[in-house]
Amino acid sequence: MKTISNSTLNENVLLPDYDRSTLKSRIVHLGFGAFHRAHQALFTNEMLSKTGSDWGICEINLFGGEDLIQSLRAQDHLYTVAEKGAESTEVKVIGSVTESLHPSLDSIQAVLEKMAEPQVAIVSMTITEKGYCADPATGTLDKNNPLVIADLANPTEPKSALGYIVQALKIRRERGLTPFTVMSCDNVQENGHVAKAAILEFAQLLDPELRDWIETNVTFPCTMVDRIVPAATEETLTEIAELLGCEDPCGIACEPFRQWVIEDNFVAGRPDWNVAGAEFVADVVPYEEMKLRMLNGSHSFLAYLGYLGGYAHISDTMTDEGYRKAAFDMMMQAQAPSLTMPEGTDLEGYAKLLIERFTNPSLKHKTWQIAMDGSQKIPQRMGGSLRFHLAQGSNFSWLATAIAGWMRYVSGVDEQGNDIDVRDPMAETLRQICDQHGLNVSVVPALLAVEAIFPVELGQNPQVIDAVSSAYQSLIDNGARATVAAL
């Protein structure tokens, strides 16, 4: 079978230009998904190209993804990333992966032994928010989670990422080895703190002494990651095969932009990812807030109002001058003033770059996809800036319009009377409220009263109720496109 490792590839493909045989698995990564392939593994590939160091990655999938691991092995752990710009595509073969494991292909013990090897200095992860087994209401470990229950009952045969990390650290401690750094790369606010809290709480239930050792000896740097990486489709893989010169079932496409901000807090050394464009900083939080409010907040605005306006993709909304202007104004007038950034941060430059990213037509990022899980996203993306404007007495009409757009969207019926497939953990609750009120402005205070989404000081604030009601009424009377154009 022809694969990347034994085929003559097209001449414009960028191949690893370093000696892969010298690499050691100094990083173990949990979660060989699309984002990691286009982000951390690619940064590592470029770092290796520039430094000639020996930081290789052992990839591990704990749940599903066996096919992906087998495909990766069949092609000597090489795979492709296609960076698709508006005008052209750059194809890179990534060589930073040294080996791979899967508990159901190898064994649980094989995974634990790999994590316990002396040269392993970092265990990184992209396991999604669910992987941290936290109770959404309290943020603490969900002791009723079936994985947590199973791992506490049988810690030497773990199932969860938490179980594997704690057991591997226990083995290292018993063998007198230095611990590794635990580095979350998930798109979760203060992800290092989330990982640390979950792991310490889990370890406390298992062995309080081990918990204390972990707290004293292990570091959990926070990271901020950014790159748009749509899920791979048959169309993507066909396109990659044509660009590459052979098939690659592990291939992934993404945008050219990438960002990685890392808290410089490592217990056993780290690669010089900064030579590949990563930034090492003392505090990641300001950068997270910048991304959450300016990128994610305007993304949500475009998702709800774009979908209602009949636009299938984010790039389609950017062909409408009203949406383009409103998104930029929202970033600069509603979100940027609410941020406290390190000196010299160019927020206007960042906003212009975001508009350029949103305009990229080759990504096909669906408004419907970004509109998912709004009840979880809106508080993070808009709550902080809403509080800022209420305190300052300044204009927050863009935020009010975004929230009204979400309310109109979760009614489950679009402007043509067609059903909307609303995907949200609270979809049922939201649907009941919307059904009670119909497309009537009385739905606004009813939805603002849902405290799991809007804390009382926001949801019961008369200015918020008035501004969102006014925007909602405009959506009913004039539709999304006219409402956005009038901002």
Residue ranges and their predicted role:
Residues 1-487:
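Substrate/ligand-engaging "lid" and interaction regions
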